[in-house]
Regions:
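Sec-dependent signal peptide cleavage junction
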Residues: 19-31, 315-325
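A cross-kingdom C-terminal cell-surface attachment/processing module
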Residues: 325-344
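C-terminal low-complexity, Ser/Thr- and acidic/Pro-rich disordered "stalk" regions positioned immediately N-terminal
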Residues: 276-321
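Serine-esterase "nucleophile elbow" of acetyl-processing enzymes
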Residues: 28-83, 95-102, 107, 126-132, ...
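Bacterial N-terminal signal peptides
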Residues: 11-20
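Active-site segments of SGNH/GDSL-like serine hydrolases
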Residues: 151-160, 176-213
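Oxyanion-hole/transition-state-stabilizing segment in secreted/luminal serine hydrolases
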Residues: 47, 89-165, 197-198
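Catalytic His-Asp segment of secreted/periplasmic serine-dependent ester chemistry enzymes
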Residues: 195-287, 291
């Protein structure tokens, strides 16, 4: 009796040891199809190897995320970033990509920079006290303006109404976008990206950069509101870029787009949120396999269920990707096999 107890204790110890050595598994189930929706930041505009007709070869954050998830461009990942698109443009274009929504289980959305860029002449006109048209002329006015000119805008009712209309339209547009996404992809994991300030601490843009923060904060507040309402994820792309806007964007050339390093930081922010690495070799996703065991007389039959489109798992694969409970189950079956003939059947 004493020896039997000792053997049981030894067996339990071995099981516990193997369980502790099991390969950790991400809590996230690997998505089968990724859809990226947004503007030129999503498409990867300005990056080496960027091609508007084929945006899958450059190092955009969307492409980097797809690589981390082991998804293939044009097959299991579609990039629908529209260069120069405002939230209104993206909303207008959604009916053309609604079919992609239907079979996407992960969707990343980013928009806002062009909405605000189109509002820059409104700010410049209010600061100058006269009508200013065009982005270049507006930037000249804003970079030369004294801080008190921006402070005075708080009491400028005409300006407040105009900029308020811009922000209200943005919130309505992204709300409508969220509604369409939720309706057509109710089970998808949807990720909105908070907008960054490309002027943050950039020499020559200090005063306007601080004022831009107030506008961008309003845009991000709208995003937070929509994500809370629809149960979407919100990733802080802003923090990823704002810490070093000069080094992570192309502002040296007066271009607000992220450079290659900036796209890496955006992709890393999303990956960290998901609990994965940008290196696909380091990622192990949750595989939903639920073994079913039936014992008939002297035969043990093991049914291993698996996703319909994957190859049958080998014993080695099960040991690599299985969870702790799978290791314990395997040990129990192994002990049973010492006395009972074992027959495995794969689904």
């Amino acid at each position: 009796m004493k020896k039997t107890v000792e053997r049981v204790i030894s067996l339990l110890f071995v099981i516990a040891l193997l369980t502790s050595l099991a390969v950790p598994v991400s809590a996230m189930k690997k998505p089968e199809f990724l859809l990226a929706i947004g503007d030129s930041i999503t498409s990867g505009y300005g990056l080496d190897a960027y091609d508007e007709s084929d945006p899958y070869s450059c190092g955009s954050y969307a492409n980097l995320l797809a690589t981390a998830l082991s998804l293939e461009g044009k097959e299991s990942y579609i990039n629908k970033g529209l260069n120069g698109a405002t939230s209104a443009d993206i909303l207008k274009n959604l009916p053309e990509i609604v079919n992609y929504l239907g079979y996407s289980d992960m969707i990343v959305f980013s928009a806002g920079v062009n909405d605000l860029q189109n509002a820059i002449p409104i700010v410049a006109s209010a600061v100058a006290g006269k009508t200013v048209t065009g982005l270049s002329a507006s930037i000249d006015v804003l970079t030369a303006a004294a801080p008190e000119k921006f402070s005075a805008l708080a009491n400028n009712q005409s300006f407040q109404k105009k900029i308020g209309d811009v922000l209200a339209k943005y919130e309505k547009n992204i709300t409508d976008i969220a509604e369409i996404i939720k309706t057509n992809a109710p089970s998808a994991r949807v990720i909105f990206l908070k907008q960054y300030n490309p002027l943050n601490n950039v020499p020559g843009f200090e005063t306007f950069g601080k004022f831009a923060d107030t506008l961008i904060s309003s845009v991000n507040a709208s995003m937070e509101k929509v994500c809370l309402s629809y149960g979407f994820d919100l990733v802080d792309m802003a923090s990823a870029i704002n810490a070093d806007a000069m080094g992570l964007t192309n502002m040296l050339n007066y271009d607000v787009h992220p450079n290659a390093a900036g796209h890496v930081e955006i992709a890393r922010a999303i990956a960290n949120h998901l609990g994965i690495s940008l290196d696909p070799a380091e990622n192990t996703f949750d595989v939903e396999t639920e073994p079913e065991t039936t014992i008939e007389e002297t035969t043990v039959s093991v049914e291993l269920t698996r996703p319909a489109e994957t190859e049958p798992e080998t014993d080695a694969q099960t040991e690599t990707t299985g969870c702790a409970s799978s290791v314990s189950f395997a040990m129990i079956v192994a002990v049973a096999c010492a006395c009972i003939p074992l027959k495995k059947k794969y689904a």
